[in-house]
Amino acid sequence: MNELTDIRAIRALLERHGFHFSRSLGQNFLICEWVPERITESAGIDETSGVLEIGPGIGCLTARLSEKAGKVVAVELDRSLAPVLEETLEGRENVEILFGDILRQDLQQLAAEKLRGLRPCVCANLPYNITSPVLTALIRADCFESITVMVQKEVAERICAKAGTEEYGAFSLFVQWHTEPELLFDVPADCFLPQPKVTSAVIRLQRREEPPCAVQDEELLFRVIRAAFGQRRKTLVNALTAGLGSFSKEEVRECILACGFEEHIRGEVLKIQEFCSISDKLIGK
């Protein structure tokens, strides 16, 4: 592990293999020892765990995961990292590197085939330019017990946000509907090569067995949520009327009042249970 956290050794490693960082891929490699240790510990990784890692970089987190997990499958887009990873992960029989785009993977099939017989989970230092689509895909796959990942701190705060805060939005509610998110710890810029211009944070998303509340039509619920936050400075009546397009302003107004809310309320102050109530009321219109 020392060679993966020594900056001079890392630079020599990358130079030896002719590697050059790609700005378009958002490459910021993890190069400190304590972060992989805390991620592995926080995720509860043990010999029963089958871990999907996304963007292994030079293998700093991969190496630590392999010491605890039953198996680690790491998906890397940049094929120029192949000789680097071959060197840094040499001899780790429980690690498999797949080269390809994580957003083009059939995640359910990958988990079923590569992590069979193990508890599937995700641990990763996510490329910041694809954080939201990757998390969306992982959550929708609905086959991972937990997702423990490093993201920009502002994204972590948005995911964990409460109703009425500036960070609260449609993505917060999507993640919180499917998982129980927890912001674990911050990671400073000097833990990466090259150093990003933002603070990072590690979050854990624990898959829910059941949604936080009952709703008649989940698709309609998220149409309502997207409409409410698509024009978040408008009143909920106006935002839903414009955003849904299938209900009159008076129908929307009646539903909101029937749920016990004031006519001029905004969606940004509503909890998920309250969005469920409005969604269910709209079904009868």
Residue locations for each model-derived region?
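Primarily EF-hand calcium-binding motifs
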Residues: 261-262
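Catalytic cores of RNA-modifying enzymes
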Residues: 1-227, 254-257, 268, 277, ...
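Short helix-coil junctions and helix-kink-helix linkers
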Residues: 241-246
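Short amphipathic alpha-helix in the helical subdomain of ABC transporter nucleotide-binding domains
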Residues: 249-252
